[in-house]
Amino acid sequence: MYYYKKASSYILERYADVSDREVAEKYVDQMKLNLKMFLSPEEIEAQIDLAPEGYRFVRQLVLPDGSATFLRLYNDMFVHPMEAEVSAALKRLIMEVPKVACLTGHGERDMNNVGDRDYYAFAKNPTFRYALVNNGFDVIAYRMTEGEEIPEDIRILVIADVKQPLTESELEKIDRYVARGGNLLIAGEPGRQEVMNPLVERFGVQFMPGVLVQPSRDFDPDLIRGELTKDATEMSLNYADLQKKKRVITMPGATALNYTMDKGFMVRPVLTTHDTGCWNEIETRDLLNEPVELNPVAGEKEGVYPIALALSRKMGNREQRIIVLGDADCISNSELMMYRKGIKASNFSLITESFRWLTDGEFPVNTRRPDPADTSISLELSSMKWVKVMFVGILPLLLIGCGILIWHRRRGR
């Protein structure tokens, strides 16, 4: 079906005092179309709510029982959905959809905000191919209320950059959520250790004091280039591919993670700092204007520091899983769109692989296939010289001969 509606900010500003119908009449007149082809805003809204889609072109897949889901276009070079997005849309129609809840109410990162530090891009931007909403998930903002437990249908709870301390009753609710097997993604920030450590200490994890630095000539000293570990490559074949390609995860301002395994969880580092040139800065407060120097006397030590952890434990016939990140900016709106010359970053892969692991491979759909086997060569070494003679000698002479023949015939005309 076709419809018209003022939706984009450009159109809304340009035609602020003009009705939707008048704008549509201008456009159809320019394009030599008939306005009767298009449903009015009132007619389309009576059939379907396209406001969350921004009234863009969208496909809807519908089953006979009324189940439906959207299949969108994306603002990238490929535009159309590919196998992963189509498969995710189809799976949504036939299985229980995992619900992701982003905790709010304590200054956390906002999944509905397009600001640089917030999470709209990876959570619910319909035009971003790797957003959770385009890969099979339902995503909501969730605020804990007095007297109510965390809903049973929340599969993954995201707690990112808490600025105000969680109350005892809120921590108890999270404890009960974890006790029943709920999964978590927790992201901290330098300066928030005191607020967030009471949350992660129950899992044997601690956000260490200070801020990690990796001084370089071109970038801020607190820009950490996280490297995938051997444990990460065992968790995900896609991580293994990224490691071979020397891809990194950029963290602009990260805190090191310390952990023990005495809380019942198996803990595996997913990302660590480089083994040289990186340390936990404790003294310097203004990293941009003050010199950043390693001071062993102050307890600063150069080495490898974990900056992302994967925690797991068996619960009945399934595995409970938790991801802890030492930086909340690495999956923010600005960092996902950031390009830095000389750094091959793949931060969106951290999102897709983390949530794939948290759902035990259900979503996002993994369309990776084994590399084709190419292990046999039928050509013998003794025959190589004739191949060389053919391609280096005979074939070039034939091409030259053909060129001379064509030139001679044309010259004769």
Regions found by a protein language model. Name each.
Residues M1-T127, A131, P364-T367, S376-G393, ...:
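Hydrophobic targeting/anchoring helices
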Residues M1-Y4, L103, Y142-M144, G210, ...:
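Conserved beta-strand termini and adjacent loop/short-helix elements that scaffold enzyme active sites
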Residues E42, L71, N113, G147, ...:
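Generic alpha-helix detector with strongest preference for long hydrophobic helices that associate
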Residues L63-D65, L73-M77, T104-H106, K163, ...:
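A mature extracytoplasmic/lumenal domain signature
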Residues Y120-F363:
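Acidic, S/T/G-rich, low-cysteine, solvent-exposed domains in lumenal/extracellular/periplasmic regions
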Residues S216, P370-A373:
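A glycine-rich phosphate-binding loop feature that marks nucleotide/adenosyl-phosphate handling sites
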